[in-house]
Curated annotation (Swiss-Prot):
Name of the molecule in the record: Unknown protein from spot 6109 of 2D-PAGE of heart tissue
Additional remark text: On the 2D-gel the determined pI of this unknown protein is: 6.5, its MW is: 28.2 kDa.
Domain of life: Eukaryota
């Protein structure tokens, strides 16, 4: 999700 993108690039899929 977008939050994952803000937190960590690896979590952008979340």
């Amino acid at each position: 999700x977008l939050k994952g993108k803000v937190x960590v690039a690896x979590n952008q899929y979340l």
